[in-house]
């Protein structure tokens, strides 16, 4: 059977080779060295070299997965289905929505595959449509994350600490993707701006500055600090060169 054209074969194969190769580099090669090298000093040095190779390949693999999420084509049916559900959207509008989906997938990958919450009704609709095509979605997740990413409904900050952390995590990495300071945002990242931009029914509205809420009488926008939530796990950014996750002033929403 012909493979789906939206998933470049070279992308997928390179990621698979790197994912397998790092485990060959460590611990398999050090075990071989232990039994084949007579000198304990040589074995230790060989193991260190293998460990360095493992780390390099793991970093290369993560880079390839990020590149895949940013550049690999989505299946054509996603845009068409999204326009069926939201007929007010143009082709360029759906492209923006799918770019928001890429931001969400990147947030999951860059947080070391931790739970991330979906902040947009529009992007959630695209995600749900993708999931209904099981084989295509499974293949995408395998190349992007190495395992399946399960669907959770779109939401705003509430009383569930896990979901609040997931939303803050999404905020942090969406901001990082657009070079926005997540603690002092001057604007919203795309993923958090789409529902308001396209007037999505039941969509979520966010503001970049909590003080904006006080200046808007009758506004249905909310700020994350209204719930008294702390930062997401400080270890979220450890694997990607970040400086700790946090929602800052901009993580909020309403429906």
Protein language model features and the residues they cover:
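N-terminal signal sequences
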Residues: 22-36
């Amino acid at each position: 059977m012909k493979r789906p054209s939206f998933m470049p074969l070279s992308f997928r194969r390179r990621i698979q080779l790197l994912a397998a190769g790092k485990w060959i580099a460590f611990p398999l090669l050090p075990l071989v060295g232990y039994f084949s090298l007579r000198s304990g000093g040589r074995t230790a040095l060989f193991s260190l070299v293998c460990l360095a190779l493992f780390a390099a390949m793991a970093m290369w693999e993560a880079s390839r997965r990020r590149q895949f999420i940013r550049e690999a084509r989505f299946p054509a049916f996603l845009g068409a289905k999204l326009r069926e559900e939201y007929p007010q959207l143009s082709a360029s509008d759906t492209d923006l929505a799918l770019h928001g989906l890429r931001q969400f997938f990147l947030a999951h990958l860059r947080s070391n595959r931790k739970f991330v919450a979906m902040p947009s009704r529009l992007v959630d609709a695209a995600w749900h449509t993708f999931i209904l095509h099981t084989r295509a979605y499974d293949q995408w997740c395998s190349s992007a994350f190495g395992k399946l990413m399960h669907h959770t409904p779109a939401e705003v900050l509430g009383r569930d600490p896990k979901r609040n952390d997931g939303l803050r995590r999404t905020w942090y990495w969406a901001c990082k993707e657009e070079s926005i300071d997540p603690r002092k945002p001057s604007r919203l990242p795309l993923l958090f701006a789409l529902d308001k931009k396209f007037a999505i029914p039941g969509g979520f509205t966010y503001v970049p500055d909590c003080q904006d809420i006080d200046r808007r009488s009758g506004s249905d926008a909310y700020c994350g600090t209204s719930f008294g939530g702390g930062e997401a796990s400080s270890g979220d950014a450890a694997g990607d060169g970040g400086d700790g996750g946090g929602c800052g002033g901009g993580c909020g929403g309403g429906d």
